[in-house]
Amino acid sequence: MLRQILSQAKKHPSLIPLFVFIGTGASGATLYLLRLALFNPDVCWDRNNPEPWNKLGPNDQYKFYSVNVDYSKLKKERPDF
Amino acid sequence: LTNTSISDAQEMETIWTILPAIILILIALPSLRILYLTDEINDPSFTIKSIGHQWYWTYEYTDYGGLIFNSYMLPPLFLEPGDLRLLDVDNRVVLPVEAPVRMMITSQDVLHSWTVPSLGLKTDAIPGRLNQTTFTATRPGVYYGQCSEICGANHSFMPIVLELIP
């Protein structure tokens, strides 16, 4: 199968960049969707633990990319309970 | 007479596949960075809670002392000349300009949405969930908005008024 793909790629080399970009885009979209499904605090898969969003840590980063704010270094301004 | 085996100008084809792709990536990456920047916490001066009810808003200023009040639309009979029908309320949300404000928005009963279009704000008020939006208004004045999620008979009659004072 892989050999077939490689031989066809050699016959039409100008199509290789096309497949590279389309492949990167599609796999990036799928991986991000999986990341959201598994790590987003709004999502819950476990019937026995229905509210995992109540156990978020104040120093964890849940965003994909944080530009200026370093969540692990945030200082704690609220009182302990 | 089909074109399945016609293959011409392959170098050109490669270039005009790769070049637009690179241009689009160069546009997309800073754009995504800006998108994530809009989500940042901007160290707000204070926090206001906005709770949607059917069919009014409750605002709580609890940072320094406890100020809690309801904000109902002014009924047409109570309007003074010069007031805006369906937009003016009895108690406005008073805020200072140039101060980053954090709004925590939720609802007591059904879905509502807290909107002030002239400040670019729209956040849904969802029962059981706390949504956050932050903003910094730079110009004093009165800013109007209306509830933006259908919530029953008086959905059109629960406006939001922000009064920004210098």
Curated annotation (Swiss-Prot), chain A:
One cellular component term from this protein's GO annotations in UniProt: respiratory chain complex IV
Stretches in topological domain Mitochondrial intermembrane: 38-81
Residues modified as N6-acetyllysine: K10
Bilayer disposition of the protein: Single-pass membrane protein
InterPro entries: B12D
Coiled coil: none
Keyword Transport appears in the UniProt entry: yes
Keywords for the protein's UniProt record, in alphabetical order: Acetylation, Electron transport, Membrane, Mitochondrion, Mitochondrion inner membrane, Phosphoprotein, Respiratory chain, Transmembrane, Transmembrane helix, Transport
Record topology, Mitochondrial matrix segments: 1-14
Record-annotated membrane-spanning stretches: 15-37
Compartment(s): Mitochondrion inner membrane
Major localization listed first in the record, in broad terms: mitochondrion
Subunit structure: Component of the cytochrome c oxidase (complex IV, CIV), a multisubunit enzyme composed of 14 subunits. The complex is composed of a catalytic core of 3 subunits MT-CO1, MT-CO2 and MT-CO3, encoded in the mitochondrial DNA, and 11 supernumerary subunits COX4I, COX5A, COX5B, COX6A, COX6B, COX6C, COX7A, COX7B, COX7C, COX8 and NDUFA4, which are encoded in the nuclear genome.
Family: Belongs to the complex IV NDUFA4 subunit family.
Function: Component of the cytochrome c oxidase, the last enzyme in the mitochondrial electron transport chain which drives oxidative phosphorylation. The respiratory chain contains 3 multisubunit complexes succinate dehydrogenase (complex II, CII), ubiquinol-cytochrome c oxidoreductase (cytochrome b-c1 complex, complex III, CIII) and cytochrome c oxidase (complex IV, CIV), that cooperate to transfer electrons derived from NADH and succinate to molecular oxygen, creating an electrochemical gradient over the inner membrane that drives transmembrane transport and the ATP synthase.
Identification of the protein by name: Cytochrome c oxidase subunit NDUFA4
Naturally occurring in which organism (per UniProt): Pongo pygmaeus
